[in-house]
């Protein structure tokens, strides 16, 4: 049990969440559960293993068997790349969902980004010149609801990732925090594309003031080649199971995914630890697929604070983050209120002038209207539409991974707004530098 579990501030917090009804991201929390890190920084976790992020781009028709160490007899370069993309995705989960437990002692409530907040950096990969430079751009494109859009790209190896994320949280009667994720990520590797959906999750350990994340439900990785990976998450039960468990199956296409016996490969283990893979119809023993403990994360290179723009996360939240590290509740309240009041005044000024905040590098596209209706709409060959169709994924703003016809997809009045990176806007950027 955490040393904070019996504190009066924690008891008050538990009482407030028990009766809370609304967006939990706006709920105040005691200082010891606050993180000094903004949600805009979470985008970096997608590429903290550059060698795995870029590996699919090095696989071609001539070398795919030698690159696929887990199966030297892999049937095609497309399948070798899908295995590499799956390994990359699994490698992102530890950073995304349990790195704060290791560095901060338990899961913390991140800072709520303000509209227009930015976080940028790069992986220079100096020890691996063949990797080239990988760039991260993250922007808070909406505050109500809170939405973070991001792009990670490596021009040398023609790898591009873009996506956006939004969460909605609620408490169960047992005070377990359930989190629905919204949004998706798209990965382009030269001529192939992959659509990735994040899983739902829940946070346990709240009653004892020692929160930790457990993933649940499913994630999908849909390839433009037709290949599909379905990842099912489970946690430790009262009587059995291990924490952070998953089972992933790779299929020839979404039709085959209806029958688990048709899986080409099955991968199982712990996403925060090790996992093994076995090939269909093979009597050989399973092989090691990935071990999170063996490959340390490579952290993003972010320029010094004095060189950052006022909109950049670490500069904007510097005083608040410092107060959180000190555990000074009064100073946290003072510095946080000052920043938030400044942002409210900006919104009031914009409203008075009849203008709205201009997003810097991302634009929202409406997938529910036609070009004649005057909105920004996707093109006919839109990658997301193609991949969503192959997966039978809902294009509405339903929880990530919602399939067409699911309960969430059938809800009325759902919009279909999705955020897309505009590379030309970054190329024209004058104020923000890496």
UniProtKB/Swiss-Prot annotation:
Region listing for ALPS motif, in residue ranges: 7-29
Please state what the protein is called. Answer: Oxysterol-binding protein homolog 4
Residue numbers binding 25-hydroxycholesterol: 96
Where 20-hydroxycholesterol binds, per the record, is at 96
Q: Which residues bind cholesterol?
A: 96
Task: Cite any additional comment in the entry.
Answer: Present with 32200 molecules/cell in log phase SD medium.
Transport is among the record's keywords: yes
Q: Name one GO biological process term.
A: exocytosis
Q: Using the UniProt record, give the first listed, main subcellular location.
A: cytoplasm
Which residues are recorded as binding a 1,2-diacyl-sn-glycero-3-phospho-(1D-myo-inositol 4-phosphate)? 24-29, 109-112, 143-144, 336, 340, 344
State the residue spans of region: OSBP-related domain (ORD).
16-366
Pfam families associated with the record: Oxysterol_BP (PF01237)
């Amino acid at each position: 049990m955490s040393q904070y579990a019996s504190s009066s501030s924690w008891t008050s917090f538990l009482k407030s969440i028990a009766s809370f009804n609304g967006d939990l991201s706006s709920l105040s929390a005691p200082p010891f559960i606050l993180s000094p890190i903004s949600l805009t920084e979470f985008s970096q976790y997608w590429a903290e293993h550059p060698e795995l992020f870029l590996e699919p781009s090095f696989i071609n028709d001539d070398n795919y068997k030698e690159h696929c160490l887990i199966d030297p007899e892999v049937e095609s370069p497309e399948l070798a790349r899908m295995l590499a993309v799956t390994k990359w995705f699994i490698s992102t989960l530890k950073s995304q969902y349990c790195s704060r437990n290791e560095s901060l002692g338990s899961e913390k409530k991140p800072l709520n980004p303000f509209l227009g907040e930015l976080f940028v950096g790069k992986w220079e990969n100096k020890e691996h010149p063949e990797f080239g430079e990988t760039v991260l751009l993250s922007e808070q494109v909406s505050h109500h609801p809170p939405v973070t859009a991001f792009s990670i790209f490596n021009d040398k190896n023609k790898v591009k990732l873009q996506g956006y994320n939004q969460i909605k949280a609620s408490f169960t009667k047992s005070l377990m925090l359930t989190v629905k994720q919204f949004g998706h990520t798209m990965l382009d590797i030269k001529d192939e594309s992959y659509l990735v959906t994040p899983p739902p999750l829940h946070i346990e350990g709240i009653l004892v003031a020692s929160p930790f994340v457990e993933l649940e439900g499913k994630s999908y990785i849909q390839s433009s080649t037709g290949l599909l990976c379905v990842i099912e998450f489970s946690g430790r039960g009262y009587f059995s199971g291990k924490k952070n468990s998953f089972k992933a199956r790779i299929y020839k296409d979404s039709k085959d995914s209806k029958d688990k016996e048709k899986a080409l490969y099955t991968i199982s283990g712990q996403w925060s630890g090790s996992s093994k893979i076995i090939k269909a119809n093979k009597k050989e023993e399973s092989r090691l697929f990935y071990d999170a403990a063996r490959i340390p994360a490579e952290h993003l290179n972010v320029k010094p604070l004095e060189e950052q723009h006022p909109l950049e996360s670490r500069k904007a939240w510097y005083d608040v983050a410092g107060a959180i590290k000190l555990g000074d509740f009064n100073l946290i309240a003072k510095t946080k209120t000052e920043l938030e009041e400044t942002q409210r005044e900006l919104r009031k000024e914009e409203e008075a002038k009849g203008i709205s905040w201009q997003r810097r590098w991302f634009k929202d596209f409406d997938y529910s209207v036609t070009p004649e209706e005057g909105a920004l709409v996707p093109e006919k060959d839109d990658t997301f539409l193609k991949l969503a169709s192959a997966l039978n994924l809902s294009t509405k703003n339903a929880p990530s991974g919602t399939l067409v016809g699911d309960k969430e997809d059938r809800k009325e009045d759902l919009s279909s707004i999705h955020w897309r990176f505009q590379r030309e806007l970054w190329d024209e950027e004058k104020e923000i530098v890496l």
